[in-house]
Protein backbone atom coordinates (compact mmCIF):
# COMPACT_ATOMS: atom_id res chain seq x y z
CA UNK A 1 0.00 0.00 0.00
CA UNK A 2 1.44 3.34 -1.03
CA UNK A 3 -0.08 6.14 1.03
CA UNK A 4 2.48 8.64 -0.23
CA UNK A 5 1.25 8.12 -3.80
CA UNK A 6 -2.32 8.95 -2.73
CA UNK A 7 -1.11 12.08 -0.92
CA UNK A 8 1.01 13.21 -3.89
CA UNK A 9 -1.83 12.65 -6.36
CA UNK A 10 -4.28 14.58 -4.18
CA UNK A 11 -1.84 17.47 -3.72
CA UNK A 12 -1.06 17.63 -7.47
CA UNK A 13 -4.77 17.83 -8.31
CA UNK A 14 -5.31 20.48 -5.66
CA UNK A 15 -2.31 22.48 -6.88
CA UNK A 16 -3.70 22.42 -10.43
CA UNK A 17 -7.13 23.54 -9.21
CA UNK A 18 -5.58 26.44 -7.27
CA UNK A 19 -3.76 27.83 -10.32
CA UNK A 20 -5.50 31.23 -10.00
CA UNK A 21 -4.46 31.67 -6.37
CA UNK A 22 -1.33 33.78 -5.67
CA UNK A 23 1.78 31.57 -5.48
CA UNK A 24 2.75 32.26 -1.88
CA UNK A 25 -0.80 31.80 -0.61
CA UNK A 26 -1.19 28.58 -2.63
CA UNK A 27 2.12 27.13 -1.41
CA UNK A 28 1.30 27.92 2.22
CA UNK A 29 -2.17 26.38 1.95
CA UNK A 30 -0.83 23.26 0.24
CA UNK A 31 2.00 22.81 2.75
CA UNK A 32 -0.39 23.09 5.68
CA UNK A 33 -2.93 20.75 4.12
CA UNK A 34 -0.25 18.22 3.17
CA UNK A 35 0.71 17.87 6.83
CA UNK A 36 -2.89 17.21 7.81
CA UNK A 37 -3.47 14.72 5.00
CA UNK A 38 -0.20 12.91 5.76
CA UNK A 39 -1.17 12.47 9.41
CA UNK A 40 -4.67 11.36 8.38
CA UNK A 41 -3.32 8.80 5.88
CA UNK A 42 -0.78 7.42 8.36
CA UNK A 43 -3.52 6.91 10.94
CA UNK A 44 -5.70 5.11 8.39
CA UNK A 45 -2.80 2.91 7.24
CA UNK A 46 -2.22 1.87 10.86
CA UNK A 47 -5.94 1.06 11.06
CA UNK A 48 -5.46 -1.35 8.15
CA UNK A 49 -7.38 0.38 5.34
CA UNK A 50 -6.81 -0.83 1.79
CA UNK A 51 -5.55 1.58 -0.86
CA UNK A 52 -9.05 2.05 -2.31
CA UNK A 53 -10.55 2.62 1.14
CA UNK A 54 -7.75 5.05 1.89
CA UNK A 55 -8.48 7.04 -1.28
CA UNK A 56 -12.20 7.20 -0.38
CA UNK A 57 -11.41 8.19 3.21
CA UNK A 58 -9.19 11.07 2.07
CA UNK A 59 -11.85 12.41 -0.31
CA UNK A 60 -14.64 12.04 2.22
CA UNK A 61 -12.65 13.77 4.96
CA UNK A 62 -11.04 16.54 2.88
CA UNK A 63 -13.46 16.69 -0.12
CA UNK A 64 -12.50 16.24 -3.75
CA UNK A 65 -9.58 18.53 -4.69
CA UNK A 66 -11.82 20.58 -7.00
CA UNK A 67 -14.40 21.19 -4.26
CA UNK A 68 -11.71 22.05 -1.73
CA UNK A 69 -10.06 24.46 -4.19
CA UNK A 70 -13.38 26.21 -4.81
CA UNK A 71 -13.87 26.56 -1.08
CA UNK A 72 -10.33 27.87 -0.56
CA UNK A 73 -10.72 30.42 -3.36
CA UNK A 74 -14.12 31.63 -2.22
CA UNK A 75 -16.18 29.51 -4.63
CA UNK A 76 -13.63 29.63 -7.42
CA UNK A 77 -12.62 31.78 -10.33
CA UNK A 78 -10.79 35.08 -10.57
CA UNK A 79 -13.97 37.12 -11.09
CA UNK A 80 -15.64 35.57 -8.06
CA UNK A 81 -12.46 36.18 -6.09
CA UNK A 82 -12.56 39.86 -7.02
CA UNK A 83 -16.24 40.02 -6.14
CA UNK A 84 -15.54 38.49 -2.71
CA UNK A 85 -12.87 41.14 -2.11
CA UNK A 86 -15.50 43.77 -2.87
CA UNK A 87 -17.80 41.98 -0.42
CA UNK A 88 -15.17 42.22 2.29
CA UNK A 89 -14.68 45.91 1.54
CA UNK A 90 -18.42 46.48 1.73
CA UNK A 91 -18.58 44.88 5.16
CA UNK A 92 -15.65 47.02 6.32
CA UNK A 93 -17.37 50.18 5.07
CA UNK A 94 -20.55 49.13 6.88
CA UNK A 95 -18.58 48.69 10.10
CA UNK A 96 -16.98 52.13 9.76
CA UNK A 97 -20.37 53.75 9.10
CA UNK A 98 -21.75 51.90 12.14
CA UNK A 99 -19.00 53.25 14.37
CA UNK A 100 -19.46 56.80 13.06
CA UNK A 101 -23.26 56.62 13.41
CA UNK A 102 -23.28 55.51 17.05
CA UNK A 103 -22.70 58.91 18.71
CA UNK A 104 -25.10 60.61 16.28
CA UNK A 105 -28.07 58.48 17.28
CA UNK A 106 -30.29 59.07 20.31
CA UNK A 107 -29.26 56.88 23.23
CA UNK A 108 -32.32 54.62 22.84
CA UNK A 109 -31.26 53.68 19.29
CA UNK A 110 -27.50 53.33 19.61
CA UNK A 111 -27.74 49.55 19.52
CA UNK A 112 -29.43 49.47 16.06
CA UNK A 113 -26.36 49.94 13.80
CA UNK A 114 -24.47 47.22 15.65
CA UNK A 115 -27.46 44.86 15.46
CA UNK A 116 -27.77 45.47 11.70
CA UNK A 117 -24.04 44.90 11.27
CA UNK A 118 -24.24 41.60 13.18
CA UNK A 119 -27.14 40.48 10.96
CA UNK A 120 -25.18 41.28 7.79
CA UNK A 121 -22.13 39.52 9.20
CA UNK A 122 -24.26 36.47 10.07
CA UNK A 123 -25.50 36.31 6.48
CA UNK A 124 -21.94 36.59 5.19
CA UNK A 125 -20.73 33.76 7.46
CA UNK A 126 -23.73 31.57 6.52
CA UNK A 127 -23.30 32.09 2.77
CA UNK A 128 -19.51 32.23 2.40
CA UNK A 129 -18.58 29.85 5.22
CA UNK A 130 -15.76 32.16 6.28
CA UNK A 131 -14.58 31.19 9.73
CA UNK A 132 -11.41 33.23 10.17
CA UNK A 133 -13.31 36.01 11.95
CA UNK A 134 -13.84 33.67 14.89
CA UNK A 135 -10.67 33.67 17.00
CA UNK A 136 -11.24 30.11 18.21
CA UNK A 137 -11.13 28.83 14.63
CA UNK A 138 -7.83 30.47 13.74
CA UNK A 139 -5.92 28.76 16.52
CA UNK A 140 -7.27 25.28 15.79
CA UNK A 141 -6.24 22.76 13.16
CA UNK A 142 -7.51 22.49 9.59
CA UNK A 143 -11.09 21.27 9.53
CA UNK A 144 -12.99 19.05 7.13
CA UNK A 145 -15.63 20.47 4.80
CA UNK A 146 -18.44 19.11 6.98
CA UNK A 147 -17.01 20.77 10.09
CA UNK A 148 -16.57 24.08 8.26
CA UNK A 149 -20.21 24.08 7.16
CA UNK A 150 -21.42 23.14 10.65
CA UNK A 151 -19.29 25.78 12.37
CA UNK A 152 -20.33 28.47 9.87
CA UNK A 153 -24.01 27.65 10.48
CA UNK A 154 -23.59 27.70 14.27
CA UNK A 155 -21.52 30.91 14.01
CA UNK A 156 -24.19 32.61 11.90
CA UNK A 157 -26.89 31.62 14.40
CA UNK A 158 -24.66 32.92 17.21
CA UNK A 159 -24.25 36.29 15.47
CA UNK A 160 -28.00 36.50 14.81
CA UNK A 161 -28.66 35.72 18.47
CA UNK A 162 -26.38 38.60 19.48
CA UNK A 163 -28.24 40.91 17.07
CA UNK A 164 -31.61 39.90 18.55
CA UNK A 165 -30.29 40.44 22.08
CA UNK A 166 -29.16 43.93 21.07
CA UNK A 167 -32.54 44.67 19.49
CA UNK A 168 -34.31 43.54 22.67
CA UNK A 169 -31.90 45.40 24.96
CA UNK A 170 -34.23 48.42 25.50
CA UNK A 171 -36.82 46.02 26.93
CA UNK A 172 -34.42 44.03 29.12
CA UNK A 173 -32.38 44.82 32.18
CA UNK A 174 -28.76 45.70 31.30
CA UNK A 175 -27.48 42.89 33.53
CA UNK A 176 -29.65 40.35 31.68
CA UNK A 177 -28.31 41.56 28.32
CA UNK A 178 -24.74 41.34 29.58
CA UNK A 179 -25.32 37.81 30.94
CA UNK A 180 -26.94 36.65 27.67
CA UNK A 181 -23.99 37.95 25.67
CA UNK A 182 -21.40 36.47 28.05
CA UNK A 183 -23.08 33.06 28.24
CA UNK A 184 -23.64 32.83 24.47
CA UNK A 185 -20.02 33.86 23.82
CA UNK A 186 -18.70 31.27 26.26
CA UNK A 187 -20.98 28.58 24.81
CA UNK A 188 -19.89 29.35 21.24
CA UNK A 189 -16.18 29.26 22.03
CA UNK A 190 -16.66 26.08 24.05
CA UNK A 191 -18.36 24.58 20.99
CA UNK A 192 -15.38 25.63 18.82
CA UNK A 193 -12.85 24.09 21.19
CA UNK A 194 -14.78 20.83 21.46
CA UNK A 195 -15.01 20.53 17.66
Swiss-Prot record:
It comes from the Bacteria. Pfam families: HAAS. The chain crosses the membrane at residues 89-106, 111-128, 149-168, 172-194. The keyword Transferase does not apply. It is found in: Cell membrane. Keywords: Cell membrane, Membrane, Transmembrane, Transmembrane helix. It is a multi-pass membrane protein. GO terms for cellular component: plasma membrane. This is Uncharacterized protein YitQ. It comes from Bacillus subtilis (strain 168).
